[in-house]
Amino acid sequence: RQMCIRDSSGGEEGARNGPAIMVGYKNKISEDLKNTLSAISAKTDQDCIGFYEGYGSGHFIKMVHNGIEYAEMQLIAEIYEILRRSKKTNEEIANFFDNLKEENRSSYLIEITSKILRQKKDGVYVLDEIKPFASNKGTGKLTVETSLNLKVPTPSIYAAYDARVQSNNKNDWDEINME
């Protein structure tokens, strides 16, 4: 008998085109299982799958991945807020993020940010109708706790997690005016 625990990443895109899969295993993993998981994984120039020896290793890799994404999303949110408070429009901010793409300083999160900034419904920017509230599922907190336990400084991840917690502590989001 073999034990295989896996975690995946990709959201909607992963559901459509296959997820990135992180497999943790306790003992040797069979070639059949490797092939099956590889077949359903996302593809770039290779299969988007990693095999990590050690029970729970796949979950650990996913946790660290999510912590890094927390930091990236917080950086994007801070850039957005600075530009917005500087009276830049959604279109101007989207153009700023597009320029990062042209300078090879892009990421998937930056690419979707410029798309989100341009989305309208009934002539109104969708983003302007969303309250600045960010929930979490616990992996950011777990990443912070793990980094503290291992004595590894992760100030960007901690600050990003803290910003999410603080966003939940606002009494009345209707009082906030970004314009």
Annotate each PLM feature.
Residues 1-5:
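Short, small-residue-biased leader/transition segments that mark boundaries at the very start
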Residues 10-17, 40-70, 88-105, 110, ...:
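Conserved Rossmann-fold dehydrogenase catalytic segment
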Residues 19-42, 63, 74, 82-88:
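Rossmann-like NAD(P)H-binding beta-loop-alpha module
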Residues 27, 58-61, 70-73, 77, ...:
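Electropositive phosphate-/nucleotide-binding environments in soluble metabolic enzymes
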Residues 66-67, 77, 114, 141-145:
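Hydrophobic alpha-helical segments
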Residues 83-96, 147-152:
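Inter-helical turn/loop segments and adjacent helix faces that build the functional surface
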Residues 125-179:
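A conserved active-site cap/scaffold subdomain adjacent to cofactor or substrate pockets
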